[in-house]
């Protein structure tokens, strides 16, 4: 099922085509809807305010995949001949399927803060990008944050940290890093898998009640997150020792648990909830004109903002390519160059209407950018997230060698000769 959300009459020769693999339906629709609305609204904003990107109108087409990998791949195969500017897979499972396909089709693939971590090695994965940061890097920032809270990294020795994770490619992604860090810092790691969709967690939390780990870190998704918070409250596990990853830190994850979620924390790579110049423009050019994809009251939510960010990066890559190559509608190779030469400075964030966001720099070798991580805390009475940390640097000295080893293995298995970045 496809639905053109942003339509105009420009001919194919003078329009930027963008495809959206969305999940407004299915088990994860409560997360998929705000995400998809952010996707659509940003492109509507560019068309309404700027006449598109570089004066070229954008045509956006959603393909509803219901968070189903097989359907998402079918969507991709059906729409790839339109040459989408940037393919955004919207799930780790889909990312793994599309990495080899997009490389053959010469279409850039961006999985923002999810997907295959070792795809950060641009010499092996020239068509794939996973900036601003990855699950492995996030895991190092979480352990740094916990260590600092305990009074120093040496205080982790002898402590127990549980990882409650969605039993999927996504949920397992942080485990190798957490194991390496457990050896490095001497904490005991409990690995507790939760099967899809995550409504049955009694056995998991019974183990936590027995073992009483010092901290619980969660890589959850959808209903798994709110269920976990309710189960933690039921065994009186302290919320100030329970930290979610950035897919376990949206309003949808905490609101169903009510007052019990108060004090719960999560990682994030952006702030939410604030009025920004970008939000003001979205209201003025999109919602005030009756062209919004959703409810204007929800444009401050975590997942909506993440949807916006996906298309901010995709369209910045298109803009980079237009300027560098002197073209109106860049090719896949040219947009790939635009992603690989992405450098979003403080001044760029001001221009984009999101002042205060951290700088991002992508290179030929590094498709992740090593972006630092923020932590936020939920206030159940105010129903809002508050950022409570500075930007926490990631341990690149730990994760980059792991990424390079995994990428080298992938290259050997797939007969890929790593390119020379010069």
Annotated model-derived regions:
Residues 293-304, 315-388, 394:
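Segments of small-molecule ligand-sensing domains
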Residues 65, 109-111, 115-120, 197, ...:
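Venus flytrap/periplasmic-binding-protein-like
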Residues 1-9:
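C-terminal segment of classical bacterial N-terminal signal peptides
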Residues 14-17, 30-37, 49-122, 131, ...:
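Beta-alpha junction/loop-to-helix N-cap segments that form part of ligand/metal-binding clefts
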Residues 71, 118, 126-236, 273-280:
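Extracellular/periplasmic Venus flytrap/periplasmic-binding protein
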Residues 232-311, 406, 417-418:
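Extracellular/periplasmic periplasmic-binding protein-like sensory domains
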Residues 79-92, 110-112, 160-165, 212-222, ...:
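Periplasmic-binding protein-like
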Residues 16-40, 64-70, 91, 164-173, ...:
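Extracytoplasmic "Venus flytrap"
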């Amino acid at each position: 099922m496809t639905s053109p959300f942003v339509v105009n009459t420009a001919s194919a020769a003078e329009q930027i085509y963008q495809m959206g693999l969305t999940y407004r339906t299915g088990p994860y629709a409560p997360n998929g809807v705000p995400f998809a609305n952010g996707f659509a609204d940003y492109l509507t904003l560019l068309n309404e305010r700027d006449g598109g990107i570089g004066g070229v109108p954008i045509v956006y087409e959603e393909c509803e995949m219901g968070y189903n990998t097989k359907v998402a791949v079918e969507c991709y195969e059906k729409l790839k001949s339109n040459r989408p500017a940037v393919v955004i897979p919207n799930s780790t499972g889909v990312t793994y399927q599309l990495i080899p396909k997009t490389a053959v089709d010469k279409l850039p693939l961006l999985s923002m803060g999810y997907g295959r971590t070792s795809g950060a090695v641009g010499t092996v994965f020239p068509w794939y990008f996973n900036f601003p940061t990855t699950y492995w890097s996030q895991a190092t920032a979480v352990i740094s944050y916990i260590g600092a809270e305990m009074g120093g990294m040496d205080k982790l020795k002898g402590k127990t940290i549980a990882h409650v994770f969605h039993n999927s490619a996504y949920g397992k992604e942080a485990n190798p890093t957490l194991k390496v860090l457990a050896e490095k810092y001497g904490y005991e790691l409990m690995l507790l898998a939760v099967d899809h969709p995550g409504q049955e967690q009694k056995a998991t939390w019974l183990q936590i009640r027995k073992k009483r780990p010092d901290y619980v870190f969660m890589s959850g998704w959808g209903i798994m997150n709110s269920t976990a918070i309710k189960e933690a409250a039921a065994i009186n596990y302290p919320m100030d020792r329970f930290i979610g990853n950035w897919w376990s830190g949206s309003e949808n994850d905490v609101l169903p648990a009510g007052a019990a979620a108060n004090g719960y924390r999560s990682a994030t790579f952006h702030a939410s909830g604030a009025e920004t110049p970008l939000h003001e423009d979205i209201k003025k050019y999109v919602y005030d004109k009756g062209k919004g994809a959703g409810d204007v009251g929800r444009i401050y939510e975590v997942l909506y903002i993440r949807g916006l960010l996906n298309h901010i990066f995709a369209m910045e890559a298109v803009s980079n390519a237009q300027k560098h190559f002197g073209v109106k509608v860049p090719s896949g190779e040219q947009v790939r160059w635009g992603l690989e030469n992405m450098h979003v400075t403080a001044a760029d964030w001001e221009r984009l209407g999101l002042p205060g966001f951290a700088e991002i720099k992508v290179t030929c070798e590094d498709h992740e950018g090593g972006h630092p991580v923020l932590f936020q805390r939920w206030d159940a009475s105010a129903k809002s997230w508050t950022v409570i940390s500075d930007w926490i640097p990631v341990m690149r000295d730990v994760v980059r060698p792991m990424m390079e080893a995994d990428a080298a293995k992938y290259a050997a298995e797939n007969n890929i000769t790593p390119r020379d970045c010069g």
